[in-house]
Amino acid sequence: MINYIFKRLEYKNYSQMISLIEERHQDEMTYFSWMKELNQIQIDQLTNTIKSMFSDHSWVGVGAFDEELLIGYIMGKCELLERKSIVKVTFEGISLKHDVSSEVLRQIYQHVSMLWIEQGCLKHEVYIPLGDNRYLKALQGLSFFEEQAYAINDLSKPLTFDKLHQVNVRIANEKDQKLIESMSDIIFSYQNQSPVYVPAYPEMVKKIREGYRNIVFDKEVTILIAEIDSKPAGFHLYESLQPTWHIPKDTCELTVAATYKHMMGQGIGRSLMIEGYLLMKTKDYRFIHTDWRIANLASSTFWPTCGFVPYMKRMVRIIDQDILWANFSHKDNQR
């Protein structure tokens, strides 16, 4: 392997970072039909995003250089989230030249992770593209695990199942305020239970409940409620999604999808999906975007059957906090 130079990224590197992302995007277009050539507006948007990283000192990144040529990089933002100091490497924060080994990403991480840990950031989140297996291979080889999948459903492709007649699906209205608030705990309760085990911090639960309390009054949101024998069984929540360099225009977000556990297995999710699919098409959307926890057994098996194709995953590694003192710099480990 070439002896690359690894050094901290600087503002002067931004144009080479953008070139690597554009190259990565070209490769991904081979796998995802909804991905198109980047237009100038998207390139400008991407340029502004990369430039802004260097105006914020919480972003820390390292690049691999072949002399002066940047051939790969990882750049993450150190922040406090959910009571922990974490590093978040966004979709723009990682890229590798197409003819370079995935091993280089592992070496870049070796260098950049030391800088993150120096700042006390022990949870590392990296959003990787799935159109190129090198990213997944590299992070799995660094003890990262898959936490969240992000997917697109192309509405030009037909659904492969039918709605069940016993399920009635309707659009929520302002009279459903208390009902929606009462159903707000469904999805988080799934996340909190086995085998997902996401902590339900009281302040987070309170924030979610307050958010749902008035969501029926939001004209930008569409809520579908499923009922069986006039009893609420589940709901889907849709809203518009702003296009980005990697999200196509005319895309809506399926933000929340939930079914009462005791009513699962009766076709509720499928019926909601069919009605949402048809309704979003009448609103001139061409794609639906959603995401799910990999460890959520119901979500991770159901959404792919609805036509959702993952294009990005959030990979996570959590470093044992004892490393901050249990190391060979500690006085008790000195000879």
PLM regions and their residue ranges:
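Acyl-donor-binding surface of acyltransferase catalytic domains
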Residues: M1, S95-H165, M312-D320
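Conserved N-terminal entry element of GNAT/NAT acetyltransferase domains
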Residues: M1-S15, L155-K175, L324-R335
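A short beta-loop-alpha structural element at the N-terminal edge
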Residues: Y4-Y31, N168-Q191
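Conserved GNAT-fold acetyl-CoA-binding loop/helix
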Residues: Q26-N48, Q191-G211
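Conserved donor-binding loop and adjoining core beta-sheet/short helix segment
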Residues: M29-Q107, I228, A233-A257
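Conserved acetyl-CoA-binding loop-helix of GNAT-fold acetyltransferases
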Residues: V100-M114, V256-T259, G265-L278, T282, ...
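Active-site/acyl-donor-binding loops of N-acyltransferases
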Residues: G141-T160, I274, L278, K283-R335
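Flexible, substrate/cofactor-facing loop regions flanked by secondary structure
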Residues: H165-K249
